[in-house]
């Protein structure tokens, strides 16, 4: 995290700019082109509906952490934000656990379990997550007979940490607040029923 801003001013600023740039891409997606000439009513309506759906997605991120994690765009935006705080390993571990649970092969399960442990859980791991010693040892024990639930405790604690710590800061960040404001304007720019047809002047 950017605790020592005086030591890493350029890096922190660069990551903050990267976050704003990535969210800027989402902003661009959420805007209708001002040039609607030459497209059919069906194409315009489809684009309008997708744009409204994206705006609703963005606004949903502030409703609950679950909605954020269930949104691909939300995860991407949150990950970009976490990179500015040098804490992206928490989300990456959570995502790795979600993918891990989908594995059905016992051989692959054991192999992947050890890989995740070495990457995120063991002491001095390259992307070591912030969990207590007891949870680390419990997870290590679980690897002796790996199942899809062997990371559940560690994943749960990491999720709680993100929800209580990083998530509120994400919602208060200027980049997300700008994005949410744009989404709010977009979602109220037309009646909730059928979208108005584009004008062809």
Swiss-Prot record:
Keywords (alphabetical) are: GTPase activation, Lipoprotein, Membrane, Palmitate, Phosphoprotein, Signal transduction inhibitor
Q: How does it sit in the membrane?
A: Lipid-anchor
Q: Where is this region: Disordered?
A: 181-201
| InterPro entries, per the entry | RGS, RGS_sf, RGS_subdom1/3, RGS_subdomain_2
Sites of S-palmitoyl cysteine lipid attachment are: 2, 12
Instruction: Describe tissue expression.
Output: Retinal; also predominantly expressed in the liver and pituitary.
Query: Per its record, how is this protein called by name?
Result: Regulator of G-protein signaling 16
Which Gene3D superfamilies would you find in this protein's record? Answer: 1.10.196.10, Regulator of G-protein Signalling 4, domain 2
- Organism of derivation: Mus musculus
């Amino acid at each position: 995290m950017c605790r020592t801003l005086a030591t890493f001013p350029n890096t922190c600023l660069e990551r903050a700019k990267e976050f704003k740039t990535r969210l800027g891409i989402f902003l661009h997606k959420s805007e209708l082109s001002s040039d609607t000439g030459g497209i059919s009513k069906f194409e315009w309506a489809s684009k309008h509906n997708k744009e409204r759906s994206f705006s609703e997605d963005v606004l949903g991120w502030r409703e609950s952490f679950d909605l954020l994690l269930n949104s691909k765009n939300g995860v991407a935006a949150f990950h970009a934000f976490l990179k500015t705080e040098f804490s992206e390993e928490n989300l990456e571990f959570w995502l790795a656990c979600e993918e891990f649970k989908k594995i059905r092969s016992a051989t692959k399960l054991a192999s992947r379990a050890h890989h995740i442990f070495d990457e995120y859980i063991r002491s001095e791991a390259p992307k070591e997550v912030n969990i207590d010693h007891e949870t680390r040892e419990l997870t290590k024990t679980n690897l002796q007979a790996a199942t899809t639930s062997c990371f559940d405790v560690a994943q749960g604690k990491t999720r709680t940490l993100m929800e209580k710590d990083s998530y509120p800061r994400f919602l208060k960040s200027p980049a997300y607040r700008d994005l949410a404001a744009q989404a709010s304007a977009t979602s109220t720019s037309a009646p909730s029923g059928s979208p108005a047809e584009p004008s062809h002047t």
